[in-house]
Amino acid sequence: QEKYQQVAVFHQDHIQKQNWNEEWEKSYEPIVVEDKCLIRAEFHKIEKVYPYELIITPKMSFGTGHHQTTYLMVKGQMEIDHRNKRVMDAGCGTAILSVLASKLGAKKVEAFDIDEWSVSNGTENIEVNNCTNIHHQTGKLSELHFMGKFDIILANINKNILLDEII
């Protein structure tokens, strides 16, 4: 009978100090959707004015416009009349869709996410975009209570999660 030995190999390198945020910022590009909406971080320089500008710094949250689903949500959302509408943003992440809903004229936006980091980051993005009509909170749809009906429901999250929450 053979005996197996487990071998652990450790290696140590010294890495020069560098500003990792600066390195990340170099590779983080702004996004333009349909030549109508600029999605950028605060550190990006504005080179052209667009009808809608969203300042989104993602930190640890999902929703920058770089992912195809977010890009498509923003593109589709710009085709919907939001004026004086009540909007729900389920699984809001960075609050990118909430901010756009506000800028498109929504009367009130209810945004929520199960992740506390996302809600914290989303709150920062809501504030930097001066969106005062967004109510933002942590929790699942089944745990939160909303009064009245919504005209628009936005949900850039997994289909199975949605089905689990609404059935």
Predicted regions and their residues:
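Conserved SAM/SAH cofactor-binding pocket of Class I
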Residues: 60, 64-142
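Amphipathic alpha-helical repeat scaffolds
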Residues: 125, 155-157
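A short, charged helix-loop
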Residues: 52-58
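A short acidic, Gly/Pro-enriched loop at the edge of an enzyme's catalytic core
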Residues: 143-152
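Short alpha-helical
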Residues: 19, 116-117, 160-161
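N-terminal auxiliary segments of SAM/dcSAM-dependent transferases
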Residues: 1-48
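Short glycine-rich anion-binding loops that position phosphate/pyrophosphate groups of nucleotides
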Residues: 44, 158-160
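A short, conserved alpha-helix within the catalytic core of class I
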Residues: 161-167
